[in-house]
Amino acid sequence: MSINDDVICNDSNNPHFQDVLKDAMKDPSRRNILRGGLGLASMFALPMLPGCGGATVTNPVTQLPAGSILGFSAVTKSILDQVAVPSGYTVKVLHATGDRLVSSIPAYSNTGAETDDWSQRFGDHHDGMDIFYVDSNGRYSATATSKAVLAMNHESSADSHLLHPRGQTSGGVNGKKFTQFGDWDVKARPGLEVLKEINLHGISVAEVSLDSTGKPTGYVVDSPLNRRITPQTLADVRGPAAHLAAIRASFVTRFDTTGATSRGTLNNCGHGKTPWGTYFGCEENWAVYFNMPANSTLPDAKIIASRKRYGVSNAVLSSTATVGSGQGWYTPTDMEDTDARFSRWNVAATGATAAQDFRNEPHTFGYNLEVDPLNPNARPVKRTAMGRFAHEAAVCGIPVVGKPLAFYMGCDSRNEYIYKFVTTAVWDPADFGGGIAAGDKYLNEGKLYVAKFNSDGTGQWIELNISNTLISGYTSSTYTGFSFTKQADVLVFTRLAADAVGATKMDRPEWGAVNPANGEVYFALTNNSN
């Protein structure tokens, strides 16, 4: 995403990391650290201990070894439109956008001639991915075997004009191109085009073929392990037992009036891999796909206020509007609206209650979706205890037997925060390969934290809990009508809770990683104006 597409939704007075750094640089010793090449990591490394709670952690500076630590020669600079790899390495396409998972549909034409709905093809904008090896008993293996599947995110439909014979169509006119970011021309779209664009998103799981040395050579069409998880795939809504009923109340729509399930996943960017062998598809820029047509009725003030904080449609389109966000997925009239597959993207209050419309549909996105890549029959799960925001990655600290697990997560938007989820359950290697059941054990119950950095090089993990009076007493002139009344609000409206406790704004926290040698946690911050 370009900086111009990334709308800033955080107008809190919380300090920005740039300001924290500026204050830190007033100390000559810290300026010398930067001049010495150790960079910000030595000054502001994330506290690693999963149980540190609100404790202050100081990060000692360690000297990096002299010389290059890369085990290969870097590629030379190039302006060619091709993938470049270091000497001694090769690159090969395993699968590409539009390739089929099953032989019952035609091979991809690359001309837009496909008449299927794309739910059995690889999506577009390949992003986070991980490989999962399979042992002789069909269970997850942490070491290489002769069989593997590749789980992969498909983030965006910004280039979906290429799926259709003559570009995107609206108002009966073709040859158009709409990103998700405010350039749809507010005219009706054809159903098949919209279905392709919807199903272009999500996650693919595909068995990869391996040569005699274990190197992937391609993928296996018709493998029983192949599947797609799209925005239309049924998912369970799970979370802490004491708050689950209230969380599910925020998921109530005409599709599921109990809120126990939701549909699919959207705009998956970064990913995560659990110690027990499941996959996280992290839902990032999901907020831009919804709209409210002209002359619609607005939902209540609390919903509208929360939408402002998340960048979701919070005002109806004017009758004279010529552009809107999303790609007009709620507009088709030439196909049946089966299971409200189109109307769900209209998030106005069209019914008397939330159970009669889709005003709550945005609440069903913004989570880590857990998928068992080795069990095609296992329903994906929205892990609500890990919070709702623009999830970019969910990286797990080094598991220690008998200790809680810690997952580190970034909210990938300008001025947003870094989070941590610490499990209540302690790690037991017997859960290795335990699938979604293991996920229930570790991910339903735990504590959610947000990071605050100080100019002296220390930092705190602040727990996000309704018992904190900064949260329970939160008010804002910008988000009039919003207040926290229960812990479920904290988990569904996590950004606002982080605002309340004074978390440090960051420059778009994107991918994270854990150093396997010492457990250090790193995040790439990718967007500022400098």
Task: Go through the PLM ranges and name each one.
Residues 1-29, 42, 46-47:
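N-terminal secretory signal peptides
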Residues 26-32, 43-63:
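N-terminal twin-arginine translocation
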Residues 82-93, 106-117, 213-259, 371-388, ...:
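Blade-edge beta-strand/turn elements of extracellular beta-propeller
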Residues 125, 267, 364, 390, ...:
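Beta-rich catalytic cores
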Residues 127-143, 265-273, 395-401, 510-515:
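Structural signature of eukaryotic scaffold interfaces centered on beta-propeller domains
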Residues 178-236, 272-347:
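Carboxylate/His-rich catalytic cores and anion/metal-binding grooves
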Residues 190-201, 214-227, 416-497, 501-504:
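Beta-propeller fold recognition
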Residues 201-208, 364-373, 421-422:
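Beta-propeller blade signature
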